[in-house]
Amino acid sequence: GYNAFNKCTGLTSIDLPKVTEIGNRAFAGCTGLTSINLPQVTKIGYNTLQGCTGLTSIDLSQVTKIGNGTFVNCTSLTNIDLSQATDIGENAFWNCTALTSIDLPQVTDIGVSAFWSCTGLTSIDLPQAIGIGERAFQDCTALASIDLPKVTNIGIGAFVGCGKLASIYLPQVTDIREDAFFGCTGLKSIVLSGTGTENSFALPTCDTTYGLGSQNFSPENLFLTGVTELTDEQITQCRNWGNKTWANIYYNYKGSPSLAEATIEELTNPDNYTKVTDK
């Protein structure tokens, strides 16, 4: 039940082979807990293991949904099996600084701030994910690359401060909210549609349902050196681009597209590049 073992700081291990459900905050604050066996659990509540700073691994292979704040501040957690999970709740892994990689093969939705400040996270596999919540990966400073082949929506500030993020693959995306990639100073490759190569950038043929929020790529210069799908028609149809969406972005396209519907920050061009402009 709720708060069943809350703040039992002397508890070091748990073996519950027949339990199928764990209530909210059941083991929250059990700072001495290092080992836990819950092989039959299918449902886990909110903040269930919050603050279990000694926990290093856990098998939740039968769980389908991870509640809000389940692993907040589990700073020693390095290994977790969530092979059947389809939903990751808000703040689920907030500040799990030791977590370096996680495989979520069935997950379709990542909640708000789900992996915020997971500073050790270098890779994540989300082959079925459709939605990425606001600030889901904010300040994941070690995250280098991520493939999101089915994602259609990316929330506000989803990847803010991911300074090592070098490439991202988003072939199905239709809506990228404000500040989604703000502070991604290492970003070199973005694929939004079609097939791309390193240092490539592809834009879908936009309509009024396609949105790019303000300041998505504005913090640092992003060089798009392999542009193969940038046409006048594609650009002029993209009417939902936010303010400064294309600030600091350069490309080697030789046409003269019009961006009359966009607001672009004034910049100085490097040699051999053309600045995306508003005229």
Task: Enumerate the predicted regions with their spans.
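Short, aromatic- and cysteine-enriched interfacial helices/patches
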Residues: 212-213, 268
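Structural signature of tandem-repeat unit edges
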Residues: 8-21, 31-43, 53-65, 75-87, ...
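Single-residue recognition of alpha-helix capping/boundary positions
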Residues: 180, 234, 263-266
